[in-house]
Amino acid sequence: MLNWEMYNSKSSEFRNNKPFPHIFMKNILNQDIYDQLYNEWPNDEHFKLVKQTMKRYHHGPSRYLDEDVQNNHHFPELSDAWNNFVSYLCSDEYITNLKNITGLEITKLTEFSIVDGLKGDYIHPHVDTSAMQEDN
């Protein structure tokens, strides 16, 4: 599903980037998976409107779906393609690869959000590893 070869080649870059570890990569999803997810993007009725004041990390208003995915990897309002993607992000394969690339002690995906940034928002697709590390 993901281009792990590309990810693995960026491990050193991730670990050494300043002022914090990060990487930016294009085309990380296999094209057929991307096309299916793109074509099955949730429609307006699936989103709740988030006002700028509600989410400090959004530049502008955005719409989002989010769920606690620790115990349930299924969003009834999403397509099979999106549910398969969420399940993959919760899989041992994904977590193990992400742990190997980042060097972080990642244990599980605890939350999943689909954010549809509206005009003026600047958030791009990303993984917040802090949300995936086990609480101490």
Where are these regions (language model features)?
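Conserved double-stranded beta-helix
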Residues: 1-12, 107, 130-135
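Catalytic core of non-heme Fe(II) oxygenases with the double-stranded beta-helix
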Residues: 76-136
